[in-house]
Amino acid sequence: MLKLLDFSLRLSVIPLSVATIWLTVTNKQDNSIYGYLKYSDLTGLKYMVFISGICASYAFIAAVSTWIRCIVTKTWLFFVSDQIVAYLMVTSGTAVLEILYLAYNGDREVSWSEACTSYGKFCYRMKLAVILHALALSCFIILAVISAYRAFSIFEPPLVPSKVVEEDRA
């Protein structure tokens, strides 16, 4: 059951990440006042595309690897890799969320006005990409918990001497 859930989550991440990449890379809008805006103008979006590519590639390799017996026994490899990918996804998602926040609200202290009134389509597509990225991240958080369970369930719980237990009760 756990193996099927693991495999399904890894497969689910692939289309979510690919859709995130597609929405972001094809995101562009022209404005007669401010000019042409495309995803490559914003470093945070380029970072999210890069991390989404890593995420989709790793999810594919890991999904295939879950059915190869010699690799499945390497629970620590999956545990560490799932943690790293989840953390990378958090960093890229928060970078784009910061861009979205500034695009919608601006920053009066540094005289930045909001951009989404002028680039509504661009902001909408960026929001959709962040939502898809968050769904992929949710899958990886669950995968990180599953891989942690697998990695740590092979150990016995520590034995507590009976003397220590008696002192704690007193």
Swiss-Prot record:
Cytoplasmic-facing ranges: 1-4, 69-83, 149-170
Record bears the keyword Ribonucleoprotein: no
Cellular location(s): Cell membrane
Extracellular-side segments: 26-47, 105-127
GO terms under cellular component: plasma membrane
Keyword terms: Cell membrane, Membrane, Transmembrane, Transmembrane helix
Entry membrane topology: Multi-pass membrane protein
Pfam families registered for this protein in UniProt: CASP_dom (PF04535)
Transmembrane segments: 5-25, 48-68, 84-104, 128-148
InterPro entries: CASP/CASPL, CASP_dom
Presence of keyword Nucleotide-binding: no
Disulfide bond sites: none
Taxonomic superkingdom: Eukaryota
Oligomer status and interactors: Homodimer and heterodimers.
Family indicated by similarity: Belongs to the Casparian strip membrane proteins (CASP) family.
Protein name: CASP-like protein 2D1
Source organism (scientific name): Populus trichocarpa (Western balsam poplar)
